[in-house]
Amino acid sequence: MDEEYDVIVLGTGLTECILSGIMSVNGKKVLHMDRNPYYGGESSSITPLEELYKRFQLLEGPPEAMGRGRDWNVDLIPKFLMANGQLVKMLLYTEVTRYLDFKVVEGSFIYKGGKIYKVPSTETEALASNLMGMFEKRRFRKFLVFVANFDENDPKTFEGVDPQSTSMRDVYRKFDLGQDVIDFTGHALALYRTDDYLDQPCLETINRIKLYSESLARYGKSPYLYPLYGLGELPQGFARLSAIYGGTYMLNKPVDDIIMENGKVVGVKSEGEVARCKQLICDPSYIPDRVRKAGQVIRIICILSHPIKNTNDANSCQIIIPQNQVNRKSDIYVCMISYAHNVAAQGKYIAIASTTVETAEPEKEVEPALELLEPIDQKFVAISDLYEPIDDGSESQVFCSCSYDATTHFETTCNDIKDIYKRMAGSAFDFENMKRKQNDVFGEADQ
């Protein structure tokens, strides 16, 4: 342990493992430690099922009807991967895909007036959807065509819209779209959590809708992917990568102290020994004095013995409840996976409802989601504080990740990873410079 490293990483959450992997591939000498005996930190998958009951202080343990405990891998933080999104690009860039198997999530749904509907995201689906009337469908189709053709480097595609100054609200107005359509475009396609985006320049929203459509075009059914055996496989895949490139891993390793000299990190002390480093990456739990609380997320893990109603008996799906529909500021999300992903016993389903906490009674806030899931065999309720670093780490060279938010995808996490990388390396993380051949996540070469 008494050695010099370029980078020491504390915590094996996904953000930390990806950065550790990328730094190792880039030739840095990396030491990666975690005080826990398991990988994944906040973003781990819990197995066997008995362990989940213990973690939530349910001392009686799972009933026999739950099947074998080791058939379960339950994610603490529910998220799916966008098929054409940044995390998939990082997996391909680093070839971590070789350690993982993915399945396409079977459907994406949106809540309107107490019912759920499939999210239409192609012209054909939009025209067949019950979400809109006939004239609305035509206007929405025009809007989708505009977005598909939009190219920020070609003003001929702008149709009078200025990507840097026209607000998204004005773009919706231009196509005369009604409130319901605006709701599902902003929340189910562009995947915003609130309506703050409406008064921002429209370019980001257009790019988000493009990402959704491109992800959908990749594999059909939905734009989302999910790894067999749960999300805990992701940090482990990147940890393997780091090890292949010479990174050193230590689990179950207590961190006694982070050693600073003249305001700059120089090492980490553990069990009486010091490992020295030039830079440090960690999650907020390792440096409570360098982070601030930025809100809370409630996540309720529900075990079901049936698929969710009105999803066509999907074995996996996402449901978005737009804030407008339930008089809130933030959307409510449901992610559902099942025995088909090797995360639950045969015939069992795991649905996780989550949202940003807005009141003193967070459990009440997710009720609209829980109603869609009834009957529920067992609930596990977690309310987590969200933390963010108080500085950018440029002086201390201590780079702290942000907590995982309520969104059901990894795009915000990837933005954090790219942001930390840029602050550490001084240059942006460049996907285009990928040294590896471009396959897709199922190992097939892109045409």
UniProtKB/Swiss-Prot annotation:
Per the record, the coiled-coil ranges are none
User: GO:BP terms for this protein?
Assistant: negative regulation of axonogenesis; negative regulation of protein targeting to membrane; protein transport; Rab protein signal transduction; vesicle-mediated transport
Record localization: Cytoplasm; Golgi apparatus, trans-Golgi network
Q: How does it assemble?
A: Interacts with RHOH. Interacts with the non-phosphorylated forms of RAB1A, RAB3A, RAB5A, RAB5B, RAB5C, RAB8A, RAB8B, RAB10, RAB12, RAB35, and RAB43.
Membrane-spanning ranges: none
Highest taxon of source? Eukaryota
Q: A Pfam family in this protein?
A: GDI
The record describes the protein's role as:
Regulates the GDP/GTP exchange reaction of most Rab proteins by inhibiting the dissociation of GDP from them, and the subsequent binding of GTP to them. Promotes the dissociation of GDP-bound Rab proteins from the membrane and inhibits their activation. Promotes the dissociation of RAB1A, RAB3A, RAB5A and RAB10 from membranes.
Q: Which PANTHER family match?
A: RAB GDP DISSOCIATION INHIBITOR ALPHA, RAB GDP-DISSOCIATION INHIBITOR
Q: Would you identify the family this protein belongs to, as annotated?
A: Belongs to the Rab GDI family.
Primary location group: cytoplasm
GO molecular function annotations of the record: GTPase activator activity; Rab GDP-dissociation inhibitor activity
One Gene Ontology cellular component term attached to this UniProt record is: cytosol
**Protein's UniProt name:** Rab GDP dissociation inhibitor alpha
Phosphoserine found at: S427
Q: Which UniProt keywords apply?
A: Cytoplasm, Golgi apparatus, GTPase activation, Phosphoprotein
Keyword Phosphoprotein assigned to the entry: answer is: yes
